[in-house]
Amino acid sequence: MEAIITKEFFEDKTTIELARDILGMRLVHQTDEGILSGLIVETEAYLGATDMAAHSFQNLRTKRTEVMFSSPGRIYMYQMHRQVLLNFITMPKGIPEAILIRAIEPDEQAKQQMVQNRHGKTGYELTNGPGKLTQALGLSMQDYGKTLFDSNIWLEEAKLPHLIEATNRIGVPNKGIATHFPLRFTVKGSPYISAQRKSRILTDIWK
């Protein structure tokens, strides 16, 4: 087992730095069916009070966003279009910033159960989107509020990307200048990136 990420990982880093630094880390969910896991290949940063695309824009505090005001490493789950999306809180208490996990590269030993969880979906479709990866990993709204440090969900050090690309976030139209913030980070060439073009897939993406 690789080194498990602790609270110290989140210290003295910005949300943007964290969104880049967790690329290549292994996201692990321990379930009744066994360990389900994969390498993170795509993230998006959401910068809280000043980010029109963030749920916590202008420090909006609701029952849904309450966990965003807690502490680094806390898990923020929310539903969108019948899908459940996974986010990690990044900043100290009271600063509601987060990272959305958009795609993972599934680990080989976990694929069989993940395919079952995805009702037979295989290949890149297994985990190449934020709602797809949570379904594959068996995550749900019941995971809201857990932490990465004392629950059945955690991060492990695994691989380092050769190159990281920064582009506009997906699905945030009509959010003023925030629509054009380059806050989506991807492992360049990964076939599991959402909406990845075949012509952009590379065979050697890890150091």
From Swiss-Prot:
Family matches, as Gene3D superfamilies: Methylpurine-DNA glycosylase (MPG)
Domain of life of the source: Bacteria
GO biological process, one term: base-excision repair
Disulfide bonds: none
Heme keyword on record: no
GO molecular function: alkylbase DNA N-glycosylase activity; DNA binding
Keywords carried by this UniProt record: DNA damage, DNA repair, Hydrolase
Pfam families in alphabetical order: Pur_DNA_glyco
Enzyme Commission code: 3.2.2.-
Matches recorded under PANTHER family: DNA-3-METHYLADENINE GLYCOSYLASE
HAMAP family the UniProt entry points to: 3MGH
Protein family per UniProt: Belongs to the DNA glycosylase MPG family.
Name this protein carries in UniProt: Putative 3-methyladenine DNA glycosylase
